[in-house]
Amino acid sequence: MCGRTACSLGAARLRRACAYRDRQGRRQQPEWLREGRYRPSYNKGPQSSGPVLLSRKHVQQDADSSERVLMDMRWGLVPSWFKEDDPSKMQFKTSNCRSDTMLSKSSYKGPLLKGKRCVVLADGFYEWQQRGGGKQPYFIYFPQNKKHPAEEEEDSDEEWRGWRLLTMAGIFDCWEPPKGGEPLYTYTIITVDASEDVSFIHHRMPAILDGDEAIEKWLDFAEVPTREAMKLIRPAENIAFHPVSTFVNSVRNDTPECLVPIELGVPKEVKATASSKAMLGWLKSSQEGSPQKKEDTLPRWKSQFIHSPSPKKSSAGILRQWLGQEGGPPAKKQKA
């Protein structure tokens, strides 16, 4: 399953990170719709809003279906046929949608057959491993290149070389209040059986679209029929992960500390270190619109971590570089 994500890039950088090639081979950046509503977060849960990619044709009928737009939508699908005047009155959870049942449930089948496919964007997602009497959170994401995001210029037209966003297959819908009012756009994340590498953490994972060709096929509902698009919904192998502090357990905690790699089996006190202060300084200067915390309000906590076998994949060292955490514990070399 997928019940918590992080998406910390500011709106302008998020747009750059989603650049793609159009049918003529030209680099394009998707236009933001309702950009002012987007709020970056290191700890995003269901019912919060998050960024998604969709075909422009959904909002502009005469548009080319291969064109993409960015929109901020609420996490947890509210079907267009929902009759209550308050979407919070829904009595079932729709933050995740199982791939094996989505064509048998009306909440998902309707929008899916209408081509309402979207790509949910995130730095990565959190998943909890249940072991013994406790749960150990992990952060799961795409393997990263070694270029530091701080080198990226905000208004650069060059290819994005910062953090590679995790791109998850989703379904969206638009609900209109029965008594009138602003339409509500919502989404759900499709889940599949976990790949072998992450099955020790949880038996389910998001359906991850690896590469622009997969993203293009999933979004272009006018050219790629549902049956063909469904072939993209499968477990992903090209992923990395590392354990993180139980600080992330509370959705109220929304700082970079949520992402920082930890070593299992080691009691660790996390506080406002010099490196974390430098990290926050970089985030303030380079990520417009990102969550900002005063240095003296950084959390301080102690956790006893459950010992478990080391993960098979990790880009933890690169994440520390991204967060300015070079002073943290060294990442162990692990099999790819």
From Swiss-Prot:
Predominant localisation class: nucleus
Transport as UniProt keyword: no
Biological process annotations from GO: DNA damage response; double-strand break repair via alternative nonhomologous end joining; interstrand cross-link repair; positive regulation of isotype switching; protein-DNA covalent cross-linking repair; proteolysis; somatic hypermutation of immunoglobulin genes
GO cellular component entries: replication fork
Site features described as Required to stabilize abasic sites, chain residue numbers: 202
Record entry for activity regulation: Formation and reversal of DNA-protein cross-link depends on DNA context. Catalyzes formation of the thiazolidine linkage in presence of abasic sites in single-stranded DNA. Mediates the reversal of the thiazolidine cross-link in presence of double stranded DNA.
GO MF entries: DNA-(abasic site) binding; peptidase activity; protein-DNA covalent cross-linking activity; single-stranded DNA binding
Transmembrane stretches, start-end: none
UniProt EC number: 4.-.-.-, 3.4.-.-
Subcellular location: Chromosome
Catalytic-site annotation from UniProt: 2 (nucleophile), 127
Region (Disordered): 29-52, 283-336
Biased composition (Basic and acidic residues): 29-38
Residue list for modification Thiazolidine linkage to a ring-opened DNA abasic site: 2
Keyword vocabulary terms for this entry: Autocatalytic cleavage, Chromosome, Covalent protein-DNA linkage, DNA damage, DNA-binding, Hydrolase, Lyase, Protease
SUPFAM superfamilies listed in its UniProt record: BB1717-like
Domain of life, per lineage: Eukaryota
Function per UniProt: Sensor of abasic sites in single-stranded DNA (ssDNA) required to preserve genome integrity by promoting error-free repair of abasic sites. Acts as an enzyme that recognizes and binds abasic sites in ssDNA at replication forks and chemically modifies the lesion by forming a covalent cross-link with DNA: forms a stable thiazolidine linkage between a ring-opened abasic site and the alpha-amino and sulfhydryl substituents of its N-terminal catalytic cysteine residue. The HMCES DNA-protein cross-link is then either reversed or degraded.
Family, similarity comment: Belongs to the SOS response-associated peptidase family.
Entry domain remark: The N-terminal catalytic Cys-2 residue forms a thiazolidine linkage to a ring-opened DNA abasic site. Glu-127 catalyzes reversal of the thiazolidine linkage; self-reversal is favoured by duplex DNA formation. Glu-127 is also involved in sensing abasic sites in single-stranded DNA (ssDNA). His-202 stabilizes the abasic sites by forming a hydrogen bond with the O4' hydroxyl group.
Protein name per its UniProtKB record: Abasic site processing protein HMCES
Annotated source species: Gallus gallus
Lineage: Eukaryota, Metazoa, Chordata, Craniata, Vertebrata
Gene: HMCES
